[in-house]
Amino acid sequence: MEAFKQQNKLKKNLFQFTLKSGKGSSLNFGDIDSSKFCDELTWVDVNPIWGFYIVGGRINGQKAITAIDSGTTFIIGSRRQLKKLIEKTPGVSYLESDGMGYGVFDCNITPNVTISYGGTDFKLSREHVARGTAGKKCLLSIVGMDSGLPLETWIMGDPFFQTTSIVFDHDHKRLGFAPQK
């Protein structure tokens, strides 16, 4: 992107992801398409020590270091982190299988999963809280595995991207988040 910016092929050194199930996803380079989101963007500075896509946030009120990753199917934390999160999420039970941690819940309810950046809350919709079923139970779209990432980093994958338009601003070393339309 830096090369395109230097060649004046981009207005700004940024890109914007808006991922949707089915049609309507977009990837914009060089400018922000505000028709893709509601409200204003919430900007969060990126700490260059951690890397560009790693920012501090909260998951259901718990402090979290998060890696923003469009290529991950789930939201992933360590098993310890997931167990701690589930203990504070009514209606969800924790189970382990094959070295992975899972949250399961009655498919007739929708557990509250809220991700916060810069003081703004982004609530996962029912469609994005559940990822499959196990009998009469639904599986939470947040899983636990011990990935070896430093600082027990959460990986914010597809369920977060499906609800939020995200701007990666390289010029100002920040990320912008807004709920999708």
Name each region found by the language model.
Residues 1-181:
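Active-site or ligand-binding cleft "flap/edge" segments
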